[in-house]
Amino acid sequence: MKNFKYFAQSYVDWVIRLGRLRFSLLGVMILAVLALCTQILFSLFIVHQISWVDIFRSVTFGLLTAPFVIYFFTLLVEKLEHSRLDLSSSVNRLENEVAERIAAQKKLSQALEKLEKNSRDKSTLLATISHEFRTPLNGIVGLSQILLDDELDDLQRNYLKTINISAVSLGYIFSDIIDLEKIDASRIELNRQPTDFPALLNDIYNFASFLAKEKNLIFSLELEPNLPNWLNLDRVRLSQILWNLISNAVKFTDQGNIILKIMRNQDCYHFIVKDTGMGISPEEQKHIFEMYYQVKESRQQSAGSGIGLAISKNLAQLMGRGFNS
């Protein structure tokens, strides 16, 4: 089969090299000779005599019809060869495209592997930093809290409150940064456990009052009666959400007050933060929970990173609850 294809292709190449006109003339000559020889042999073996009239008639018929047959045959061969060349070109182009796609896919795979490795390295680094960072930070918070229970004058107490609240705030900021990476990797988890709810609210009140006092604002809690003393929740995550909301309210409130209102609807609790700040336009409210978004109308463009509210919304949704402006 391979030899047949080889000889067929060689024949086609030979026809193409000769050209349509020369091949037609050569074909006519060959057919004329064949027709003459065939007629002579036929006459000798069948009739036992040579009829020159029949020979002349056969040769004349062949010479009249052969050029057309050979011409169209040559035309067909040329078209088939052009089609073969076009097909071969298309196959080569397709092979090149496949090779390019394979190379591009290989590069993409290598880039993804590198990205995954960088992500793993980043996660490992953040986990290490988190451990190394929280240990001394918790020590600062704990020791400052112990010292606040001693007898101190007003100046000393204010200094210690500043240290305590600053350490707590720094911890929440660092939690936002850690959670930012966990949210991207869909690895954030909740740690629900029985929590002293009044103690949690007291901690919130202490740092919120301190933040508000620095700007001559008034912070207050509005609690619905008969709230339970113990709740099964993630204390760290809830504190993180409330810290983001309250600190955001403090940043964008120049005068007046900030209120944290807590209401209960059966087993659902609503935490509402109100302030007397400049407010946010309805158009801006559509975007404030987007990652890295900052209010354009704000006079304090550099006041935050734009991740606190976005992370808080993700945490609230992880708890199975809504988060609205």
From Swiss-Prot:
| Record topological domains on the Cytoplasmic side | 1-26, 79-325
Residue ranges, Periplasmic compartment? 48-57
Nucleotide-binding is among the record's keywords: yes
Listed InterPro entries? ArcB_TM_sf, HATPase_C_sf, His_kinase_dom, HisK_dim/P_dom, HisK_dim/P_sf, HKR_ArcB_TM, Sensor_HK_Regulatory, Sig_transdc_His_kin-like_C
UniProt entry keywords in alphabetical sequence: ATP-binding, Cell inner membrane, Cell membrane, Kinase, Membrane, Nucleotide-binding, Phosphoprotein, Transcription, Transcription regulation, Transferase, Transmembrane, Transmembrane helix, Two-component regulatory system
Residues in Histidine kinase domain copies: 128-325
Membrane topology type, per the record?
Answer: Multi-pass membrane protein
**Could you tell me where this protein is found in the cell?**
Cell inner membrane
An annotated Gene Ontology molecular function: phosphorelay sensor kinase activity
Q: Which SMART domains match?
A: HATPase_c (SM00387), HisKA (SM00388)
Under CDD domains, the record lists: HisKA (cd00082)
**What's the Enzyme Commission number for this chain?**
2.7.13.3
Identify this protein by name: Aerobic respiration control sensor protein ArcB homolog
Gene behind the chain = arcB
Please give the SUPFAM superfamilies that the UniProt record associates with this protein.
ATPase domain of HSP90 chaperone/DNA topoisomerase II/histidine kinase, Homodimeric domain of signal transducing histidine kinase
Any one annotated GO CC term: plasma membrane
Phosphohistidine, modified sites: H131
Q: Which domain of life is it from?
A: Bacteria
Q: What is the lineage of its organism?
A: Bacteria, Pseudomonadati, Pseudomonadota, Gammaproteobacteria, Pasteurellales
The reactions it catalyses are: ATP + protein L-histidine = ADP + protein N-phospho-L-histidine
Briefly state the protein's biological role.
Member of the two-component regulatory system ArcB/ArcA. Activates ArcA by phosphorylation.
- Bilayer-crossing regions: 27-47, 58-78
Origin species, per record, is Haemophilus influenzae (strain ATCC 51907 / DSM 11121 / KW20 / Rd)
